[in-house]
UniProtKB/Swiss-Prot annotation:
Compositionally biased tracts (Polar residues): 68-86, 116-125, 654-675
Function: Pore-forming subunit of the rod cyclic nucleotide-gated channel. Mediates rod photoresponses at dim light converting transient changes in intracellular cGMP levels into electrical signals. In the dark, cGMP levels are high and keep the channel open enabling a steady inward current carried by Na(+) and Ca(2+) ions that leads to membrane depolarization and neurotransmitter release from synaptic terminals.
Annotated source species: Bos taurus (Bovine)
Positions of the UniProt region annotated as Calmodulin-binding CaM1: 671-681
Catalytic activity from the UniProt record: Ca(2+)(in) = Ca(2+)(out); Na(+)(in) = Na(+)(out); K(+)(in) = K(+)(out); NH4(+)(in) = NH4(+)(out)
Membrane-related topology note: Multi-pass membrane protein
Name by which UniProt lists this protein: Cyclic nucleotide-gated channel beta-1
Length: 1394
């Protein structure tokens, strides 16, 4: 039934061997299968069933007789009772019954949660003596049981093999362990002289670990031999079962209460082995166990195998191991019975976390001090027995390994000292954190003494030679700010208090694996030390690591990761003398590198059946998160992350293995890559610093220079949202595609019909369509007003043409109706300052207005009376009431007409004509009323009735006279009314006509009055006639060009916004083209436009003169100006046209240049815009960016003007002039002719003299040209960006006597005259140079060196003249220097001003 457990559990590597149990008097039984590292699921399974092959250890437990040391050690290990069970126990029971009872007891211990005993005395004792369960390699269940019981507990167990009373005592003991106990050190333990020598005081309560977990992991293992005295090196127990010591008899009620409490919290759940062993969630400690178990098997070949650690076994070890100042001893691996070598486990310090937990539990254990004293006594006795066994075994093994031990002592001596120092530092650091002083300080002192004693014992233990199975997790300290180096030190400390050889190897291994990117350096040394070291040190190291992680919580996921690491591990065969060490990171692959205060401890891997030495080292804190410090370790960690290895801990089996070599290569390559990256980054930083330095320097030199970060960027203008801009083009495209016309066989595209949509609302002030509509309405109104009286008075409407009259009448009515229903209903209006465009509101506004009433009256349907009274035109008189449309049309038309006064004159004339029209109609009606031709006054009916009547009306209204006198009363009244109308009304209209005409000529009148006043003023002061003529000319030109004398008068009444709009429309197109203002803020230019003044200059007027103070800048609006220069100041240097600007240098006042540098004269009538310096400064205050830009441009222009002129260097200057005496002699010789000439030599000399004279003349001319050019450049600086137009200038006259041909001429006859005409191929040097006034375009190419060749005095002799202008580089350099000087001076001036 229980056979499946055997298949699951690991098997021992060799045949059962005997352990030293002769003292106990029990026969050695076959060794149990090693189960030190069984996972939690194995322990759970063992609770249910145990393989029959594993004998019970109960009898051996009973047979064990513990001395005072043994009891002391057992007293030290009450929390480690299960650790003893986890260790390999020998087959101590010869009877099946004892085996079954032992198995049942173990199962119960596994099931029942075991609290961690936190009593300080027991912890110290466990740290000092490492309970016999841990120190004796062949420790039996009896010893395991006495770990926490009184001295009589083990004899009673030896006598009573039955588990009943023992089980009850064990329950009581474990209950006491779980309950808080007051920290008290038993005097028996204090009396022991070897307590302090065995190890440092455990600062933290290592007894908090569940002993249940230990019991679950080791149901039966070989029992250890009797302990040896403490004075000698205590050999650690061989792999045995560290059976939990029975607790002293306590209150059963407390036990039942505890059981009920634990059952309520949680029941242990079975765990699948494949997942690394999961422990109960209620386990007080879930830290992984790091154990170094030594198999005392055959020493032929040792394999380094990475085994999985059982968490329950590890927790048991945490309770019993003495690692990190904890009283717990690590579990002993299963030992072969043939070589029952007991290896003692050294105590280690407990991490700070465990100490804190101990403190919390110690506060709860105040009421159990007496019970602790009894357990302390038992532990002391157990420890004494274990020490005796250890010493005996050390003596036997010491003789064999003296030589090897001495060598290893020399190598590891230094390491031991370092370990001791670190242990002391850690103990001191932890001691500071402990809030409880007295008891804890004493425990630390005892722990340190124990460590020293253990080190002495380890010297002899190192001599032992046996195969080692090293299953340890080097758990780094769980400090938050711990670096990689501190982790390696902690790992080295794991074995420091144990066998120093092994500890040194483990320390070197951990340090090298962390700091050297886990290279293989020192691997052989570590392996040899591990192989040569005794199991005592190894077990101690594992115990320390167990203690480090003992107070940490263990998660199921972490256990699964540990089993995955187990799957990757494999044993490597090695020799006995040089065992190979396989080091792998069990969980670094899945753990982040960030610190965590309470990291879960690693899960102990199960032992492999192979005989091997395996060191499982988690490179990072297993299950913990590390927070790294910025040090070299960070770079190493970065290299690890970059390397192909998934884990930061590299596994190696031999120093020369290919894997290690590859790792070294990868580390080297990544290091080189990192160095290259760092170099690149440094170079980039240097470059950035240089750029910043240059910017700061430039800013200090020139304050106008601003960086992109400092200069405020103008906020972009907010654009109005465009309604669906993308949809319209698409629609337009569709419309274009649709408009195709097919005609016959051709298909061509036609223009689409324009779609006009009637507006929803109409602006009556600006809508031209509405004005056009009003024009039609006024036409209809005039039809009615003019023709209704005619049709009524004159007989022009007859039955033959009545239909035409009616057609026109009703057409006018239709226009009226459309105006009311369509247009007037859509007119916008203003209400409360808002323009109302709502249709309903507009309709309501029109309906409520006076105009609507008049429109309704004019459309009264009086035409229906035609049916009764006939067609009478007087019935249409209401149509004339639409006079409001007429007046509105007049206003709208005047607003859009450029010359409104013309329309006003026409309209006034129309009023006069209409009044005459009405009078003529009335006169015909009066004549018809009395009878045509009846009297002399009436119309006689001859000729055109309308024309005759109209003429009579004109004579009557104008009161010209000459009309016939009225005879009847009717005629007298009618004529009186006509006269009255003509005198009163008609005179008013004539006066209005005068006003209209006067208004039309008001400007001209003002111009005349101003001119007359000015002429009167000049005559009064007797101004010269020339000046008066120029003034009159100015008046006339200004009036004709502008239509007014002063534009500013018109702008005064307008608001600023309107003035700006007008100025933009008039002047912006000109100012925006000025190169000086390009790039400036647009708003600045707008503000500047309002400050511009328009001035007209007459021909030859001086705009500015050289040397005067410049306060204005000029922009040419129309006309031209000429820049004059030269020696006389009258040479035209350049002509500026419209759009050019000059005077800006003086205006900006850069470098103190406020004086004019040239004369500027108006060429013809010129209209200039003038910008005053004061106005510009006021504007630039609000635009600092534009100010800086303008100043830069002005400096550049000034620098160009002040450029040094190119000076030609004459390397071979011409010869000096001929002395006068020599000239006289030549003249005399010339007169002598051929006699003194010697074949024409004198003629040649005469020609040479003429050439020299020509050279002198050319030099003088060149001087004059250079002066002219200098003045011209100064004038060009004034012009700014003007487009120069060089007028044609007369070139300087060529020298009269150029040089002769360069080739030697033939000898001339004496009578031959001197050659007057020079050869064209050999002009003199001056003739080669073009005048400086010519532009560069006249010279196609400028050579750096100019060479001129002339004839010498001798025909065969030639003179070489070379001109070398200055180099361009030197020019640029000089320009830069001058620019820097100017900028520096300007910056200083500004600072002084500020």
């Amino acid at each position: 039934m229980l056979g499946w457990v055997q298949r699951v559990l690991p098997q021992p590597p060799g045949t059962p061997q005997k352990t030293k149990q002769e003292e106990e008097g029990t026969e050695p039984e076959p060794e149990l299968e090693p189960k030190p590292e069984t996972a939690p699921e194995e322990t759970e399974l063992e609770e249910v069933s145990l393989p029959p092959e594993e004998p019970c250890v109960g009898k051996e437990v009973a047979a064990v007789t513990l001395g005072p040391q043994g009891t002391q050690e057992t007293a030290l290990t009450p929390p480690t009772s299960l650790q003893a069970q986890v260790s390999v126990a020998p087959e101590a029971h010869s009877s099946p019954r004892g085996w079954v009872l032992t198995w049942l007891r173990k199962g119960v211990e596994k099931v029942v949660p075991q609290p961690a005993h936190s009593s300080r005395p027991s912890q110290n004792i466990a740290a000092g003596l490492e309970s016999p369960d841990q120190q004796a390699g062949a420790q039996i269940l009896g010893q395991c049981g006495t770990g926490g019981s009184d001295e009589p507990s083990e004899p009673s167990r030896a006598e009573d093999p039955g588990p009943g009373p023992w089980l009850l005592r064990w329950f009581e003991q474990n209950l006491e362990k779980m309950l808080p106990q007051p920290p008290k050190i038993s005097e028996g333990w204090r009396d022991e002289p070897t307590d302090a020598a065995l190890g440092p005081e455990p600062p933290g309560p290592a007894l908090e670990i569940k002993p249940m977990l230990q019991a679950q992991e080791s149901p039966s293992l070989p029992a250890p031999g009797p302990p040896e005295p403490e004075e000698e090196p205590i050999p650690e127990p061989q792999p045995t079962i560290q059976a939990s010591s029975l607790p002293p008899p306590q209150d059963s009620a407390r036990l039942m209460a505890w059981i009920l409490h634990r059952l309520e919290m949680a029941l242990p759940q079975p765990v699948i082995r494949g997942k690394g062993g999961e422990q109960e969630s209620d386990a007080p400690v879930t830290c992984d166990v790091q154990t170094i178990s030594i198999l005392p098997g055959e020493q032929e070949e040792s394999h380094l195998i990475l085994e999985e650690v059982d968490p329950h076994w590890e927790e048991d070890e945490h309770q019993e191991g003495s690692t990190s100042t904890s009283p717990r001893t690590s579990e002993a691996a299963p030992a072969d019975e043939e070589k029952g070598k007991v290896v003692e486990q050294t105590p280690r310090e407990l991490p700070r976390i465990q100490e804190e937990k101990e403190d919390e539990e110690e506060e709860k254990e105040d009421g159990e001090e007496e019970e602790e004293e009894g357990r302390e006594k038992e532990e002391e006795e157990g420890e004494e027995k274990e020490e005796e066994e250890g010493r005996e075994k050390e003596e036997e093994e010491g003789e064999k390994k003296e030589e090897e031990g001495r060598e290893k002592e020399e190598e590891e001596g230094g390491e031991k000292e370092d370990e001791e120092g670190r242990e002391k530092e850690e103990e001191e650091g932890r001691g500071k954190e402990e809030e409880e002083g007295g008891e804890k300080e004493e425990e630390e002192g005892r722990g340190k003494e124990e460590v020293e004693g253990r080190e002495e014992e380890e010297d002899e233990e190192e001599e032992q030679d046996h195969s080692v199975l090293l299953d340890s997790y080097l758990v780094p300290q769980s400090e938050e700010d711990r670096s990689e180096e501190s982790e390696t030190q902690d790992q080295s400390e794991v074995g420091g208090a144990q066998a120093q050889g092994e500890v040194g190897g483990a320390q070197a291994l951990s340090e090298e694996s962390e700091t050297q990117d886990q290279s293989e350096v020192g691997g052989a040394q570590d392996q040899s030390e591990v192989g040569g070291a005794q199991a005592q040190g190894e077990v101690g190291g594992a115990q320390e690591q167990d203690g480090v992680g003992g107070a940490q919580d263990q998660s199921t996921s972490h256990q699964e990761l540990q089993e995955e690491a187990l799957a990757d591990s494999s044993g490597v065969p090695a020799t006995e003398e040089h065992p190979e060490l396989q080091v792998e990171d069990a969980d670094a692959d899945s753990r982040p590198l960030i610190a965590e205060e309470n990291p879960p401890s690693p899960v102990q891997l199960p032992l492999s059946p192979a005989k091997s030495d395996t060191l499982a080292v988690p490179g990072s804190a297993t299950g913990s998160l590390r927070k790294r410090l910025p040090s070299q370790d960070d770079e190493a960690e970065e290299l690890k992350m970059l390397s192909p290895a998934a884990s930061p801990v590299v596994a190696w089996s031999d120093p020369t293995s290919p894997q290690g070599t590859d790792d070294q290569d990868r580390a080297t390559s990544t290091a080189s890559q990192n160095s290259a990256i760092i170099n690149d980054r440094l170079q980039e930083l240097v470059k950035l610093f240089k750029e910043r330095t240059e910017k700061v320097k430039e800013k200090l030199i020139d304050p106008d220079v601003t960086s992109d970060e400092e200069s405020p960027k103008p906020s972009p203008a907010k654009k109005a949202p465009e309604p669906a801009p993308e949809v319209k083009p698409a629609e337009a495209g569709q419309v274009e595609e649709e408009h195709y016309c097919e005609m016959l066989c051709c298909k061509f595209k036609r223009r689409p019909w324009k779609k006009y949509q009637f507006p929803q609302s109409i602006d009556p002030l600006t809508n031209l369509m509405y004005i056009l509509w009003l024009f039609f309405v006024v036409l209809a109104w005039n039809w009615n007003c003019w023709l209704i009286p005619v049709r009524w008075a004159f007989p022009y409407q007859t039955p033959d043409n009545i239909h035409l009259w009616l057609l026109m009448d009703y057409l006018c009515d239709l226009i009226y109706l459309l105006d009311i229903t369509v247009f007037q209903m859509r007119l916008q209006f203003v209400r409360g300052g808002d323009i109302i465009t709502d249709k309903k509101e507009m309709r309501n506004n029109y309906v409520k207005s006076q105009r609507f009433k008049m429109d309704m009256l004019c459309l009264l349907p009086l035409d229906l009376l035609y049916l009764k009274f006939g067609v009478n035109p007087l019935l249409r008189l209401p149509r004339c009431l639409k006079y409001m449309a007429f007046f509105e049309f007049n206003n709208r038309l005047e607003s859009i007409l450029s010359k409104a006064y013309v329309y006003r004159v026409i309209r006034t004339t129309a009023y006069l004509l209409y009044s005459l029209h009405l009078n003529s109609c009335l006169y015909y009606w009066a004549s018809a009323y009395e009878g045509l031709g009846s009297t002399h006054w009436v119309y006689d009916g001859v000729g055109n009735s309308y024309i005759r009547c109209y003429y009579w009306a004109v004579k009557t209204l104008i009161t010209i006279g000459g009309l016939p006198d009225p005879r009847t009363l009717f005629e007298i009244v009618f004529q009186g009314l006509n006269y009255f109308t003509g005198v009163f009304a008609f005179s008013v209209m004539i006066g209005q006509m005068r006003d209209v005409v006067g208004a039309a000529t008001a400007g001209q009148t003002y111009y005349r009055s101003c001119m007359d006043s000015t002429v009167k003023y000049m005559n009064f002061y007797k101004i010269p006639r020339s000046v008066q003529n120029r003034v009159k000319t100015w008046y006339e030109y200004t009036w004709h060009s502008q239509g007014m004398l002063d534009e500013s008068e018109l702008m005064v009444q307008l608001p600023d916004k309107m003035r700006l709009d007008l100025a933009i429309d008039v002047n912006y197109s000109i100012v925006s083209k000025v190169a000086l203002f390009q790039g400036c803020d647009r708003q600045m230019i707008f503000d500047m436009l309002k400050r511009l003044r328009s001035v007209v200059y007459l021909p030859n007027d001086y705009v500015c003169k050289k040397g005067e103070i410049g306060r204005e800048m000029y922009i040419i609006q129309a006309g031209q100006v000429q820049v004059l220069g030269g020696p006389d100041g009258k040479s035209v240097l350049v002509t500026l046209k419209a759009g050019s600007v000059f005077g800006e240098i003086s205006l900006l006042a850069v470098g103190g240049g406020n004086r004019r540098t040239a004369n500027v004269v108006a060429h013809g009538f010129t209209n200039l815009f003038i910008l005053d310096k004061k106005d510009l400064n006021e504007i630039l205050v609000h635009y600092p960016e534009s100010q800086k830009l303008l100043r830069k441009k002005a400096r550049r222009m000034l620098r160009n003007n002040n450029k040094p002129k190119e000076k030609s260097v004459l390397i071979l200057p011409p010869r000096a002039g001929t002395p006068k005496l020599f000239n006289a002699a030549l003249a005399a010789a010339g007169k002598m002719g051929a006699k003194g000439g010697r074949g024409g030599r004198l003629a040649l000399l005469r020609a040479r003299l003429k050439e020299l004279a020509a050279l002198e003349a050319a030099a003088r001319q060149q001087q004059l040209l250079e002066q002219a050019k200098s003045s011209e450049d100064a004038a060009v600086g004034e012009e700014g960006s003007a487009s120069p137009e060089q007028p044609p200038r007369p070139e300087p006259p060529a020298p009269e006597a150029p040089a002769p041909e360069p080739t030697a001429p033939e000898p001339l006859a004496p009578e031959a005259p001197a050659p007057e005409a020079p050869a064209p191929s050999s002009p003199p040097p001056a003739s080669q140079e073009r005048p400086e006034g010519d532009k560069d375009a006249a010279r196609p190419e400028e050579h750096p060196v100019r060479i001129h060749v002339t004839l010498g005095p001798d025909p065969s002799e030639q003179i070489l003249l070379v001109e070398v202008p200055e180099k361009q580089e030197e020019k640029e350099k000089k320009e830069e220097e001058t620019e820097e000087k100017e900028e520096g001076e300007e910056a200083r001036k500004e600072k002084e001003e500020e």
